[in-house]
Amino acid sequence: MGIQGFLQKLSGLLLLLCALPWAEGGKVLVFPMEGSHWLSIRDVVRELHARGHQAVVLAPEVTVHIKEEDFFTLQTYPVPYTKEEYRHHLLGHLQNFFETEFSLKLVLQTMAAVNNVSTFYVRSCRGLLHNTALIQSLNSSSFDVVLTDPFFPCGAVLAMYLRVPAVFFLQSMLCELEFEATNSPNPSSYIPRLLTLNSDHMSFLDRVKNMLYPVPWMYLCHVNYGSLARLASDLLQREVSVVEILRHASVWLLRKDFVFHYPRPFMPNMVFIGGINCANRKPLSQEFEAYVNASGEHGIVVFSLGSMVSEIPEKKAMEIAEALGRIPQTLLWRYTGTRPSNLAKNTILVKWLPQNDLLGHPKARAFITHSGSHGIYEGICNGVPMVMMPLFGDQMDNAKRMETRGAGVTLNVLEMTADDLENALKTVINNKSYKENIMRLSSLHKDRPIEPLDLAVFWVEYVMRHKGAPHLRPAAHDLTWYQYHSLDVIGFLLAIVLTVVFIVYKSCAYGCRKCFGGKGRVKKSHKSKTH
């Protein structure tokens, strides 16, 4: 362990020791989201359990990834759909991103897919909030904090109803509602909007696009979150908006870091924990250690399109397999679909792989990823250059940011050929600049006084100890939109200026009439007398 690692461990230990007088074991209600969202919040739950806290994870009976484990109590509630229906609506739309060229049709399909998934979350939330017995049981359990992912903020509604402080754990939200809810400054002049693929240095036309692009997505958010707002209003017996629900958060734990995201202002209750999923790196199992050792001097390439992609269209899978067979490295490909008939000997298909552990191995040469934030951070943490094949959502923006930093190459999964993938892999493996750039990002990312996991746990315990964090809440929440932008002050000052100008103008006009108007009349009367 180097001195930097020792200091990080020491700072984490000191932070823990400082918290010990107050950390007598609290009760944490966890309301996670599905998929990779659960995988990182799960590490926080495990660490809270290790520090003596009792965690209850609340989840629907029908889930894909959330399973009972020994470091938390799983509390489920019935929902009005089957696992097959849920899988179809959660995962089925992904096939479109391999088959449909980018067009208005694809945009509409994407919006429809988001709406379908949101419909399932609304049904799940309704199943919870209308479960009177469960709600009463939770209310009597005296939880100290609710830890939840607000991407679909059912957990935030529950925290409001239980009158328990909430800690939000997230990467981002639809329509970037996290910035509206926290009143973070968000000018479109230099802060790129989600899905625009803009950087923080924009041309005039980029800024026009940046301002207009969010408009249709605001409509989508209004539709998607409107049902939740009505559910919340019924439960709370008063009219509430989604933004008001989100403002209940005491602290926002954001899986962000400025080595990955563009610099921008944030509020004091927004804490960066980017790279939290890199914390638990373990030794490889005998199976994977054997694969890595057999790769020889050429090393390995890790390939995963995430937990949500289970199958790729046959033609595209064969193109990928052909490209992988052309490079000397050993390919470890996480894939659960039909085995491509042209799969080369250097490519090993596995149903699951320890992605972070493999990327941390010295023989890791490249990482083929769909550009999900978890994978990107694991690539940064371990200093492995990337070939990125974004499929949907913020993955496009993630890939753009890494490409602009010279840490990877982006491919269009719809248009790429076997030659394109082969060339991209050879570029990031053989061109030393990619390795140097990703190592520089890795060094910047790791140069911090405390590990993200320790920081996340500290803030959850902080909210428990102090029953919230109202002192971090900016007064901007209490202002109307025109007060926030000082439009009333501007209007008042403008009225004063106009009044002064009007008075000066009238005074000058009156003075001119007095000075010159009388002389004119005298001259006219004198002329009339001479005639």
UniProtKB/Swiss-Prot annotation:
GO MF terms held by the record: enzyme binding; glucuronosyltransferase activity
UniProt-listed GO biological process terms: animal organ regeneration; bile acid secretion; estrogen metabolic process; vitamin D3 metabolic process
E.C. number: 2.4.1.17
Statement: the UniProt record of this protein carries the keyword Zinc: no
Localization per record: Endoplasmic reticulum membrane
Annotated signal sequence range: 1-25
PANTHER family, A to Z: EG:EG0003.4 PROTEIN-RELATED, UDP GLUCURONOSYLTRANSFERASE FAMILY 1 MEMBER A1
Listed name of the protein: UDP-glucuronosyltransferase 1A3
Annotated organism of origin: Rattus norvegicus
Taxon lineage: Eukaryota, Metazoa, Chordata, Craniata, Vertebrata
